């Protein structure tokens, strides 16, 4: 029964793997709820500050911030790539990196080079493998992202855009839709999107502001907060998507392990039955010979 012993060993191995994937599924479910709470808490702030920034872009303030201006002469664009630090989350990272690759090719076709900021180990490794120019990165964010860890690397691109060195800054991440669905997106962070401005105009809301103490100090602070909040929201969305994708992936792995165990047990029983039948046949044949 050497074959039976080998099958029993495989069954034991798959059962141990099933215990691990089940535990990871439960941990991911717990982290997912916390990540969703953080994401949903931050979403109203990021949406409101985006609306205010768009209002400023379509108004006629006495001071125009560099983030509102189009750097037409620049031949370099910035791309912020948000991925996970760890794997085992299905095709989530693959999908967002595929979207980033499409954007890089689009920029290349336009004669525009790219400088990247990687947030997450998976994106950093990918960008290094494809030979992209990575000017800064942030990894090891843990389960709770902190803005102070994010803004340093991102500020490299923001300062470059303000200095007129970049034509645009794009933000790529995985947007959380629901537990079973996440969407890879590449959004324009800078300059303020003309599509967003047009949407605000068609919605019928268009106004200017009175600035105190002066327009420059208010707008400078506000648009920096705008960029920071959108990057933080992207990371929060990405983390919620990560835990959801990992929970689903681990559940699928647990279910598959159960199916493999059932199939192995069936093979084991058939092998054992065949061995017993062979032994009985030999005994009967021996008795008949006597």
UniProtKB/Swiss-Prot annotation:
Q: Which Gene3D superfamilies match?
A: 3.40.1380.10, ATP synthase, gamma subunit, helix hairpin domain
Question: One GO molecular-function annotation for this sequence?
Answer: proton-transporting ATP synthase activity, rotational mechanism
- List the record's Gene Ontology CC terms alphabetically: plasma membrane; proton-transporting ATP synthase complex
Which UniProt keywords are listed? ATP synthesis, Cell inner membrane, Cell membrane, CF(1), Hydrogen ion transport, Ion transport, Membrane, Transport
Where is it mostly found? membrane
Q: Name one GO biological process term.
A: proton motive force-driven plasma membrane ATP synthesis
Where is the protein localized? Cell inner membrane
- What membrane topology is annotated for this entry? Peripheral membrane protein
State if DNA damage is listed as a keyword.
Answer: no
What the entry lists under InterPro entries is as follows: ATP_synth_F1_ATPase_gsu, ATP_synth_F1_gsu, ATP_synth_F1_gsu_CS
Question: Sorted alphabetically, which NCBIfam families does this protein's record hold?
Answer: ATPsyn_F1gamma, PRK05621.1-1
Recorded family membership: Belongs to the ATPase gamma chain family.
Function of the protein: Produces ATP from ADP in the presence of a proton gradient across the membrane. The gamma chain is believed to be important in regulating ATPase activity and the flow of protons through the CF(0) complex.
Q: How does it assemble?
A: F-type ATPases have 2 components, CF(1) - the catalytic core - and CF(0) - the membrane proton channel. CF(1) has five subunits: alpha(3), beta(3), gamma(1), delta(1), epsilon(1). CF(0) has three main subunits: a, b and c.
What name does this protein carry? ATP synthase gamma chain
What's the source species for this entry? Delftia acidovorans (strain DSM 14801 / SPH-1)
